[in-house]
Every structure is written in structure tokens, then in C-alpha cells.
């Protein structure tokens, strides 16, 4: 009588290291002097966070740019607020995103006037301004390129592809792709 050897049954589970998640949402607004002050107020009003002003590093005489000249401002949103904010900002563009705006690991879109954002009212001291929105995606394992000791490289297979971002945007955010 021969013993029958049972092979373990493999359960098809999704690899947790292949999961795609939204890392951060970055809002950016440019301008110099008076427009920069208005941009800082606008981004603070939209996010409720502290805004960082961006200064130039290079000298470009044809544009009148010198090192240390403040040219724009930015806010990075992480944590639980990022999805709520991104859904709200997509409301300004009628929940639509052009496919050509999606790149590997991120997508970006612009909002021409902040008045298009739901629940935003006209602010007399700000006037009419627009802003840029960038959403960055990541997989687990990115720490390899961020750590100081024994730093490694992120292989191409760990990048988030355009198709995966399209899937995330349509399923989780309910955005229509054009």
C-alpha cells in the first residue's frame, strides 16, 4: 500500500509588495512679489496647512531671476486628508483627467481658477488665481532609496505604471479618463 502524498494547495493571494498607494498630493502656485503673497493665502485657504515658499537657485538674466528670489509656493499633503482633498480638487475639473497627463509614478493637472473648486468662495484679497495639482504614487519598498545607510536603487518593476494609475483613478476616485 503506497502512501498518497498530498501537495499543499497554493492560495492565490495578491502580493502586498505590488500594492499601489497614493503617497502624497502636492499643490503648487507660482508668481513673484504681490502675486506670491496671494498664492500663499490661497494654498493656505484650500489646505489649512503651512505653505512653503520656493526660491530660485540659479541666475537667469533674461527672465530677471536671481538666486534667492522667491518664485512660487507649494504645499504637500500626506495622511488621510490627501484622498479627500484630491476628490475635492477633481470636482473643479468636472471629475475628468486627460490620459496624457498621467506619467509613470504620478499624474498632474491644473485648475485655472480656484473658484471652480467646490465650496470655495471668491476672496477679494486674493483675486483670481489658478494652481497645479500633482498626485504621487508609490509601492511598498521605496524606503530602499530614501535611507542613508546601505542605500539601494528602486528597480523599474517597482515603479507604478500608467495603467495601474488609470485603474486607481477610475476605481478609487471615480474620475473619468479622456
Task: Describe the residue ranges of each PLM region.
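Ribosome-associated RNA-binding proteins
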Residues: 2-178
Amino acid at each position: 500500500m503506497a502512501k498518497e502524498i498530498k501537495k499543499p494547495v497554493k492560495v492565490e493571494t495578491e502580493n502586498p509588495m505590488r500594492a499601489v498607494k497614493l503617497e502624497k498630493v502636492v499643490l503648487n502656485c507660482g508668481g513673484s512679489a504681490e502675486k506670491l503673497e496671494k498664492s500663499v493665502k490661497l494654498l493656505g485657504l484650500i489646505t489649512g496647512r503651512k505653505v512653503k515658499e520656493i526660491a530660485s537657485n540659479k541666475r537667469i538674466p533674461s527672465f530677471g531671476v536671481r538666486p534667492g528670489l522667491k518664485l512660487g509656493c507649494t504645499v504637500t499633503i500626506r495622511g488621510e486628508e490627501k484622498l479627500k482633498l484630491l476628490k475635492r480638487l477633481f470636482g473643479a475639473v468636472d471629475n475628468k483627467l486627460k490620459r496624457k497627463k498621467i506619467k509613470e509614478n504620478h499624474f498632474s493637472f491644473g485648475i485655472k481658477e480656484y473658484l471652480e473648486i467646490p465650496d470655495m468662495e471668491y476672496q477679494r484679497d486674493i483675486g483670481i488665481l489658478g494652481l497645479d495639482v500633482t498626485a504621487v504614487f508609490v509601492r511598498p519598498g521605496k524606503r530602499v532609496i530614501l535611507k542613508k545607510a546601505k542605500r539601494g536603487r528602486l528597480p523599474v518593476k517597482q515603479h507604478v505604471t500608467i495603467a495601474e494609475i488609470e485603474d486607481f483613478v477610475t476605481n478609487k476616485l471615480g474620475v473619468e479618463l479622456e
